[in-house]
A protein has these predicted regions:
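Charged, solvent-exposed interaction patches on well-folded alpha/beta domains
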Residues: 1-8, 71, 77-245
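Terminal hydrophobic membrane-targeting helix
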Residues: 12-117
Length: 245
């Protein structure tokens, strides 16, 4: 009987005006504004901290490609906090989108999701619609180039281009020591994937298999022949080829 009383009391409390959601706050977001996320969350009017549909809110937020995960936290007495973990830009991909060789630049996350198109003109209406953080992060990300025509990026979808996936595997498979020196990756095919370092050295990795072993060989050659190497081929990791400046 006592449990029944508590159950009825809890139901009544959750459906009363107690602990009404009066404020929605956002934490952890960098590429999305608080207003954007609050609008996307669409917390129903009249919600309380006791009856709010946290799963529904999380599902709506996760529909945005920047949102990797989210927790909806109740902060009593009247605040709902949206704690966002965002995807980050792992690479910027120059994609040929039509037979006229029109190229678009797209931000790609480390898990292979297309995040957003990055307009070349930052001052255009489309460019101004993006936060500065997108352009700032894009400037510091590796660029993947030479992608053959055929890919159709769409924000929120996962990349299914094998050339891009292999290039991403090369980028994410390297340690910071070499990855931090990267400038761009040419990915005309999986077998010919080539990384260009900031110092101009080109490294032909080929496929991303055995990437740590390939990286180790490259670092060793660069150390042994410092300032003298312009090209390294480690497509076959146990038979490296290098060319001097």
């Amino acid at each position: 009987m006592l449990l029944g009383v508590f159950g009825i009391g809890g139901f009544a409390l959750s459906n009363s005006g107690a602990f009404a959601v009066e404020q929605v706050t956002v934490s952890g977001a960098d590429h999305l504004s608080g207003d954007e996320l609050t609008e996307l969350a669409a917390v129903p009017a009249g919600s309380t901290l006791l009856n709010v549909d946290a799963n529904g809110i999380a599902t709506r937020l996760a529909a945005n490609p920047w949102v990797k995960s989210v927790s909806v936290d109740r902060v009593f007495p009247n605040t709902l906090n949206l704690n966002i973990t965002e995807r980050s830009i792992s690479a910027v991909v120059a994609v040929t989108v039509d037979s006229s060789n029109t190229v678009e630049r797209w931000a790609l996350s480390s898990d292979g999701m297309w995040l957003t198109k990055i307009p070349d003109d930052r001052n255009s209406a489309e460019g101004k619609a993006l936060p500065d953080s997108v352009y700032n992060d894009a400037e510091n990300a590796l660029e993947i180039t030479d992608i053959p025509y055929g890919s159709t990026p769409e924000a929120g979808s996962y990349c299914n281009n094998s050339n891009v996936e292999n290039a991403l595997g090369v980028i994410d498979g390297m340690t910071t020591e070499l990855a931090g020196q990267g400038k761009s990756v040419a990915a005309a095919s999986s077998d010919s994937t080539t990384l260009t370092l900031q110092n101009g050295i080109e490294i032909a990795f080929g496929d991303s298999k055995d990437i740590r072993d390939k990286e180790r060989v490259c670092l060793q050659l660069m150390k042994e022949h410092e300032g003298k190497i312009s090209y390294i081929n480690v497509r076959v990791v146990n038979k490296p080829v290098w060319r001097s400046v």
